[in-house]
Amino acid sequence: MAADGKGVAASSGCRKTIGWRQKYWFDSRNRCAYITTMARRMAAARRRNRNEEHIVTVEKVALITAAGKGMGAAIARELAATGYRVALMSPSGSAVALGEELGGFGIQGSVTEEADIDKLVQETIARYGRIDAVVNNTGHPPKGELLAITDDNWHAGLDLILLNVVRVMRRVTPIFQKQGGGAVVNISSFAADAPEQPMPVSSALRAALSAWTRLYAERYAAENIRMNAVLPGFIDSWPETPEIVARIPAGRFGKTGEIAKTVAFLLSDGAGYITGQNIRVDGAIVKAL
């Protein structure tokens, strides 16, 4: 213990904590302890503010479909890096390995199979007891000439692009309601706003997904449940050609990591007033509408 010049004992720990405030030392150790406590609280607040800047979460749980590779895997890695427990699904076994790598889990399954969706949701709740975020990602539907695409292929596209989202949300929405909120991002395509002749099924059904995103967001906004869609342009998980690059005003393909960071923001508290939006991340390939 050391004296402060007025005969008042003050601990070296307090002196170190308050530094230049030594001239305010005083009459009792209680005042010193009070200042020390306030200094610690201020330091904790500064740490919290730094964390918020990086969209760090604590033990939130994100469910991600088609997460075995490409954008889905990049999103899983980004969310895991910002603090989420991840629950992954993909048709291949790659989501299983990635889930284990990221400290979560994965299953092999398809968004077109209701039993697989049930398994993913049920296992997530069994392991973690909650679901805070959903990323509805899928593969690509059949392509073909506009009138040559068969009814079966149109139905397959509907199953893959739109009904998968409906099915997931039927199961997760009651969980969100019980928890008091949740956030969803649907991965779509720029073709929802600018249809591409080589991919009519994707163009038409992703436009339908944009409408459904708005409908869902409006219906559940009052319950603190948000839904947005991200509409990527050409991303580096696709084969890159000079012809495609020439179409993109930004002069390059997008990166899966850029999509992942956009998704992480939309799921964060910082995007708490953003819902019902279809957000293009496309290097300006779609002209203003």
Model-based region annotation:
Residues 174, 218-219, 272:
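Alpha-helical segment proximal to the catalytic Tyr-Lys
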Residues 169, 205-206, 213:
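Active-site helix of classical SDR
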